[in-house]
Amino acid sequence: IFGPVKKVTTTAELIEQKHLADFTVKCIILQHTDENRNLMKKALYKDEIEWIVMNKHRNKFIKNLALSLKGNTLILFQFVEKHGKVLQEMFGNPEDKIMLYVDGNVDGELREDVRVVAESNDNVIIIASSGTFSTGVNIKNIHNIIFASPSKSRVRNLQSVGRGLRRSEGKQRATLYDIADDLSWKAHKNHTLKHFEERMKIYGSEKFPYKIYTIQLKE
């Protein structure tokens, strides 16, 4: 009735066959100060993630990282007012970058404008809500993705990764920068660090090559 079972081609196989861009994950674990670790050791998940996305030193790190990258960069966030708008204001209008912003309130016509600008330039930074961009905007010319907000959703993470995997003329490679936060205190491991470990399992199962970098977050 159903016919023979066909094996689904993996993402890694599609990359090897040159249907998708070469893809690398750079995991950046931000080491927070002992003072902040102690402060957050009993925090609930919602309080921890709110503290993380509103941390000005972390956001400054994201800004400096994005400005240092070549090609078009997509920065994905979850919370519009608490994070997206804050990042938008922090970036301002740097001389050598084209800054674009997308959240759920941006209509279809403006989203199309974003797509056109990104497809025709190689110095664009797009600050976008992950919910909007994971399914709602189709841009091939993305060279870098920065996960600015932690998430453990397999579907959303893979949808977001898919933004960078599409090949385009002149683009052969894409890099994901997965930013994690180590707020562990003694034997206690913080919520979002556990979620990062779940994302690591996704990268492993999808056979994405990855490297882990540990950085002391400067206060």
Regions from the PLM with identified roles:
Residues 1-26, 203:
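Post-DEXD/H (motif II) to motif III coupling segment of the RecA-like Helicase ATP-binding lobe
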Residues 5-9, 26-28, 146, 177, ...:
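Hydrophobic/aromatic beta-strand patches that form the interior of the parallel beta-sheet core
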Residues 23-39:
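Inter-lobe connector of SF1/SF2 helicase motors
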Residues 35-93:
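Conserved interdomain hinge at the start of the Helicase C-terminal
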Residues 49-55, 100-105, 123:
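Short, flexible loop segments at the rims of nucleotide/cofactor-binding pockets, characterized by
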Residues 68, 72, 207-219:
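Long, largely alpha-helical accessory region at the distal end of helicase-like NTP-driven motors
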Residues 74, 92-113:
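Conserved RecA-like helicase motor-core motifs
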Residues 103-205, 209:
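Conserved RecA-like P-loop NTPase helicase motor core
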